[in-house]
Amino acid sequence: MTMRYTNTAPVLFALAMIGLMPAARAAEAPQPGISSEASAAIRQMSKTLSANEFSFQARTIRVYQDDDGQPLHVFHTVKVVAHRPDQLAVHRTGDDGATDLFYDGKTVTIFGVNENKYARVDAPNNIEAMLDDVSERLNVDFPLADFLNVDPGKMFLSGVTSGRELDPVTIDGKPAQHLFFSQAGGIDLEVWLDKTEQATPQRLIVTYRLLPGQPSFIAVFSDWNFSTHPSDAEFVFQPPAGAKQVELQAPQKKESK
């Protein structure tokens, strides 16, 4: 999981969803420093999340340090519908408003619901490249993007230097695996997978240990559905009355005090 931290609270498209990078084939053998149990669990998760169609929800929290050194928390609920290779819809609501993303294989539209403004740009012809493109345009990270990659396991382990399985836990009455990974650059990843053949993600925590205040990203997943059959219309944005089209721009950086 290749990641960089950005305070995305003021960004129009600060979707708490979604590391990013090109598709690659899953490793056949455990990487050095990653236990066989942890590697096997991620491979099983990857097999499940490689489905052509699926949807899920996630409740997320971004924890970051403000200019005065105080830890602040931003909560979101994210709903994701994916149809590989080239359709994606994301609906995010939270403390800083609501934002929708629609990708139909040709264009990507980002709609600020509260502002009734949207930006639409031409996009690459697959989900991974589209997310990478938007990430570069806005200079933000999308911590759930690896789960949307065509090879989620490979991308999740990208940059990881060590990994192991911790003690088993129970989540909502169901057994789960608790895995811990360290990534170069002082980033720690914890992921909880449903202890079934599907091994769907149940929780994710990303901690940036070397940054001031050790900011983190937390996600709790639910409602995984691999039997969904979304229509093409779900991925096409229809501007509501009075909506204004704007340019897609990166957020302005605050000047240091």
Question: What do the PLM-derived regions correspond to, one by one?
Answer:
Residues 254-257:
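Short, solvent-exposed mixed-charge patches
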Residues 56, 110-146:
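Acidic/charged, solvent-exposed loop-and-adjacent secondary-structure segments enriched in E/D, K/R, S/T
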Residues 10-20:
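Bacterial N-terminal signal peptides
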Residues 134-164, 235-239, 252:
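Surface-exposed, charged, gly/pro-rich loop-and-adjacent secondary-structure segments at domain edges
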Residues 22-26:
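Sec/Tat signal peptide C-region and signal peptidase I cleavage site
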Residues 33-117:
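N-terminal mature ectodomain segment of secretory-pathway/periplasmic proteins
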Residues 33-38, 43, 59, 109-110, ...:
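Gly/Pro-enriched, hydrophobic low-complexity segments
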Residues 2-12:
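Bacterial N-terminal signal peptides that target proteins for export
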